[in-house]
Amino acid sequence: MFDLYINCGGKKLRCGYTTGSCAAAAAKAAAKMLYSQENLEHISINTPKNVELDLHIESVKKGSDYVECCVIKDGGDDPDVTNGIEIWARAEKSEKEYTLKAGIGIGIVKGEGLYVKKGDFAINPVPRIMIEKEVRKVLPQGKGVTITIFVPEGEKIAKKTFNPRLNIVGGISILGTTGIVVPMSEEALKESVKLEISQKVASGYKDLILLFGNMGEDKARELGMDIKKSVIMSNYVGFALECCVENKIEKILIVGHIGKLSKIAAGCFNTHSRVCDVRLEVMALELALMGADKKIVEAVYNEKTTEGAVKIISEEYKDIYERIGYKIKKRIEDFTYGALKAEVIMYCMASGILWDGRSKIDENN
């Protein structure tokens, strides 16, 4: 078991290793056994993070002119769907010094704007470098090898990853910039947001729909929106907006639950509850500014959830959602120094759409 830990929120979490590290290890082991006839149970590789990994070779298959090796992906305490899958590498003797190919279960890139060009197999640049570097360490002088990376369960697993959204079909991607998986890595989540936005731009979109998660996607689909132009930004609102500006996006529509959106109204651009939780304060403040009875303001302020708060707010104060919506719009446009035009659709689970600011915003500009 890989023995590297981090402290996250007071918890000791075990790190893991990427699909790129698995592929590099499997390829190195297969290439070494192809020419040395050794029987290996472990193989060592170095990672871009300068952490040496000693990985177990789970399975080996040999033929007259090839060797196949398997390494099991261990993501540590990171809740990734690729954890536990088999990453295989096949090494075959070749007249050419080094060739990398992809087989079953490795995705093919069908869109623009990613790290790998359209039409190529989805093994990212850093893993490609790692695989070649490690294979060359064990390749005898004057000998050549063709390495094929494949993942038997890749096509099935890929349906649960971001690949379908990124227009990568047929399998998973071989990923990793450091070789090490850091549990609950904020940088990894941000990178997926950045990639998805750049991919949408490369596909020709000038305006995007930003969503917090699957519920927002369901709501957008329910409203008949073009999901192809949507990006799930998770809690990283500010980061997503910066990426939109960087990619010269002209307009964004945020579709979200009032519990998330109300935080933006208060100027919070990371909506994780540990970073910012002013949902009910925002609603109570708006009610007070509208002249609502003190009992209603206090009841909303003391509520446990925004869903509960919505039930308390009477028809008399339904304009609260429009007020919050305009504040969200202004916060976003101020945050991006006017580079983005913002529109907002706010909903809750019990009452549905609370405010659809699209036509209203257009009328007021």
Curated annotation (Swiss-Prot):
Pathway involvement of the protein, from the record: Cofactor biosynthesis; adenosylcobalamin biosynthesis; cob(II)yrinate a,c-diamide from sirohydrochlorin (anaerobic route): step 6/10
GO biological process: anaerobic cobalamin biosynthetic process; methylation
Catalytic activity: Co-precorrin-5B + S-adenosyl-L-methionine = Co-precorrin-6A + S-adenosyl-L-homocysteine
Superkingdom as given in the UniProt entry: Bacteria
EC identifiers of the protein: 2.1.1.195
The keyword S-adenosyl-L-methionine belongs to this UniProt entry's keyword annotation: yes
Keywords, in A-Z order: Cobalamin biosynthesis, Methyltransferase, S-adenosyl-L-methionine, Transferase
Record GO terms (molecular function): cobalt-precorrin-5B C1-methyltransferase activity
Pfam families associated with the record: CbiD
HAMAP family named in the record: CbiD
Family of this protein: Belongs to the CbiD family.
The protein, known as: Cobalt-precorrin-5B C(1)-methyltransferase
Organism, scientific name: Clostridium kluyveri (strain ATCC 8527 / DSM 555 / NBRC 12016 / NCIMB 10680 / K1)
